[in-house]
Amino acid sequence: MKAKKILKLLLLLVFFSCQKNKNQETSSWTQITPKLFFQEREEKFYLKSGGHECSFPKEKLPFKKVIVLTTSQLGYISALGEEERISGIAGAQYVYSEKIRNLIQENKIQTVGTDQKYNLEKILALKADAVLTNYMPNLADTYEIFRKNGINVIFLDEYLEEKPLEKTAYIKLFGKFFGVEKKAEKIYQEIETNYLTLKNQAAKAGNSPAVLSGEMFGNHWFLAGGKTFAAQYFKDAGADYILKNNQDEKSISMSFEEIFSKSQSVQYWVNLSNYTTKKELLNKNPAYGKLRVFREGKIFAMNNRQKGDANDYFESGAIRTDLVLRDYIKIFHPEFFPNDTLVYMKELK
């Protein structure tokens, strides 16, 4: 019996020691969002972003030159006024910012390919401090080439965050990258205050209209899962999303028949791509005409700020989540902000 007690005591000591070490390890990281952490230790900067980790010498900070392969991250750089730190960009046709477009025309920012096919020689020649991008599994070999040539590849998947303000919070990391932490924190605090004020206003609305999102691609309807930032927008804007009880953190696909069944009481259909009229939408897929919301409800696309292929919802909208929320509130509850115009959304007539 005595031996068993000693064994139990030893096991407890090991358990609490492991817990202590685990807590110390966790507390040494600065958390920006549930998916984004960094720490500075032993002359190195460490970053955890989603399922990815990287490190580089602290002396690299602040970055002088970066290459951006995903235009959704340009909104953070523009908000900080650090556009001239960009030395290269992929998918230039998707850039909305007038300042960045001008820098490209002046050859101060080099185009380094499309968002799926990069000019490796050009990227390597630019000798940037870091490459910023979303992670694309099919480009894993390309990322390895960057690393072997001494380029820090930083994966930032802000679009996978579950809450809008968590997307905004990425500006804190960009502030760290460019040595403007105080400015980044101030911007975040202003947007957070605006967002929470708007959310509280929406909570006072007398109704929660039913909402459908997404559209058909091929034979499947793709729409936001119930644990995505889009679903959180709908909730914070005082709407009743048809997938509010769904547990998926990414977009999911459903058949048209499933959507038809779930959307009988829907009053608003939002988050469509670049359509300008209901007729154009119907020409794309005549089945839409069977939906009650198509005939009797209101439909909104995310293209009020669109220039060719460039859509500012995916650029400045990544950080200005307060403006996106205000759009949704104005859509779902027209009695709010009667004198304001929509920023990112546009109604299809």
Regions found by a protein language model. Give the residues of each.
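Sec-dependent signal peptide recognition
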Residues: K4-L12
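Hydrophobic h-region of N-terminal signal peptides that target proteins for export
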Residues: L11-Q19
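Bacterial Sec-exported substrate-binding components of ABC uptake systems
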Residues: C18-L74, K183-L212, K278-K279, R295, ...
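A short, structured surface patch at a secondary-structure boundary
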Residues: Y46-G50, E59-L124, A130-Y135
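Second-shell loop/turn segments in exported
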Residues: P62-K65, Y76, K108-T114, A130-T133, ...
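Extracytoplasmic ligand-binding site segments that recognize negatively charged/polar headgroups
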Residues: I89-K99, N138-T142, D157-K172, N207-Q232
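Structured C-terminal subdomain patch of bacterial secreted/periplasmic proteins
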Residues: L165-G179, K183-K186, N271-K349
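Flexible, glycine-rich surface segments
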Residues: N200-N285
